[in-house]
From Swiss-Prot:
Function recorded in the entry: Catalyzes the formation of 4-diphosphocytidyl-2-C-methyl-D-erythritol from CTP and 2-C-methyl-D-erythritol 4-phosphate (MEP).
Site (Transition state stabilizer): R19, K26
PANTHER family registered for this protein in UniProt: 2-C-METHYL-D-ERYTHRITOL 4-PHOSPHATE CYTIDYLYLTRANSFERASE, CHLOROPLASTIC (PTHR32125:SF4)
GO BP terms, alphabetized: isopentenyl diphosphate biosynthetic process, methylerythritol 4-phosphate pathway
Broad enzyme group: transferase
Biological classification of the source: Bacteria, Pseudomonadati, Planctomycetota, Planctomycetia, Pirellulales
Superkingdom, natural source: Bacteria
Record-marked site positions (Positions MEP for the nucleophilic attack): R167, K221
Keyword terms, alphabetized: Isoprene biosynthesis, Nucleotidyltransferase, Transferase
HAMAP family on file: IspD
Pfam families, per database record: IspD (PF01128)
Name used for this protein in its record: 2-C-methyl-D-erythritol 4-phosphate cytidylyltransferase
C-alpha cells in the first residue's frame, strides 16, 4: 500500500460537556481564542494529503457548528453529519460520507489510495511530525495509530488489594487512528452495534494488524477543565509546533 494517499478526516464531535463541567459541548470551549474543534481541524486542513474533514455532530449542536464553520476560512471542505448516541454510531455515519467521496475519487483517479483518519475533536495539539508518520505507516500497512508509552506505574485492583502491572510494551492509545478505507469499512460492517473502546479494536477483531506509531504526550484529550489549562501551557511553550 504505497500509492498516493488521499486522506479523509473524521472527527466525532457529538459528545456532551458533562465531565468538563459545562452545560454545552466542551468543543465550544476556547483555547487561545478559538474553539477546541477548530484547533483540531487546523492541525489537518493545510496538509496536502487531506481532502475533506467530516464532523459528526449532535442535532442540538448542528446549527452552532454550521455558524462557526461559515465564519472561518477552510482550505478543505468541512462536512457535517448527524452523529449517533455512541462514538461508534457517529463514526459510522461519517463513514458514509467518506465512502461517497472515495467512490468519486476512484472514478477520477484509480491510483489514489483513500485513507481514513479518525481523530478526537477534543485533541487540539497533535503534531505535524506525528501525523506524517502515522499516515505514512497506515499507507504502508492499512492500519496505524498514534500511541504513547505508559510512563507511570500501573496497578490492577484485586480482591485482596492491588498488584503491579508490568508496563513494558504497554501504550496509551491516542488519535488519529488511520486506516485504509476498505479496512475500516469492513470492521464497521462486521461489528455494527458492538461496543469497542476505540476504532482500532474493531479493526483488530477482523485480524488485521494495527501498527503503533509513537506519538507525543502533548496530544492530550481535553476531558476536564484542568486539561484545558495544560493545553494552554503546551501551546504557549511550543507554539511553532502547532501552526
Amino acid at each position: 500500500m504505497n500509492c498516493a494517499a488521499s486522506v479523509s478526516v473524521i472527527m466525532p464531535a457529538a459528545g456532551s460537556g458533562q465531565r468538563f463541567g459545562s452545560q454545552s459541548n466542551k468543543l465550544f470551549a476556547h483555547l487561545d481564542g478559538k474553539p477546541l474543534w477548530q484547533h483540531a481541524i487546523d492541525r489537518f486542513q493545510h496538509r496536502g494529503d487531506v481532502r475533506q474533514i467530516v464532523l459528526a455532530v449532535s442535532e442540538e449542536d448542528e446549527s452552532r457548528f454550521r455558524e462557526q464553520i461559515a465564519a472561518i476560512s477552510s482550505a478543505v471542505p468541512i462536512h457535517l453529519v448527524r452523529g449517533g448516541a455512541t462514538r461508534s454510531e457517529s463514526v459510522g455515519a461519517a463513514l458514509e460520507q467518506v465512502k461517497r467521496f472515495a467512490a468519486e475519487s476512484a472514478a477520477a483517479n484509480a491510483s489514489t489510495q483513500t485513507l481514513v483518519a479518525i481523530h478526537d475533536a477534543a485533541r487540539p495539539l497533535v503534531r505535524q511530525s506525528d501525523l506524517d508518520r502515522v499516515i505514512a505507516k497506515a499507507a504502508e500497512t492499512g492500519a496505524a495509530i498514534l500511541a504513547a508509552p505508559v510512563s507511570g506505574t500501573l496497578k490492577r485492583a484485586t480482591g485482596d488489594g492491588s498488584e503491579t502491572v508490568d508496563r513494558r510494551n504497554t501504550y496509551v492509545a491516542l488519535t488519529p487512528q488511520v486506516f485504509a478505507i476498505d479496512v475500516i469499512c469492513q470492521a464497521y460492517a462486521r461489528d455494527r452495534g458492538r461496543m469497542a473502546t476505540d476504532d482500532a479494536q474493531l479493526v483488530e477483531r477482523t485480524s488485521h494488524p494495527v501498527q503503533l506509531v509513537t506519538g507525543s504526550a502533548d496530544n492530550l484529550k481535553i476531558t476536564f477543565p484542568e486539561d484545558l489549562r495544560i493545553a494552554e501551557a503546551i501551546l504557549n511553550e511550543c507554539r511553532s509546533e502547532f501552526v
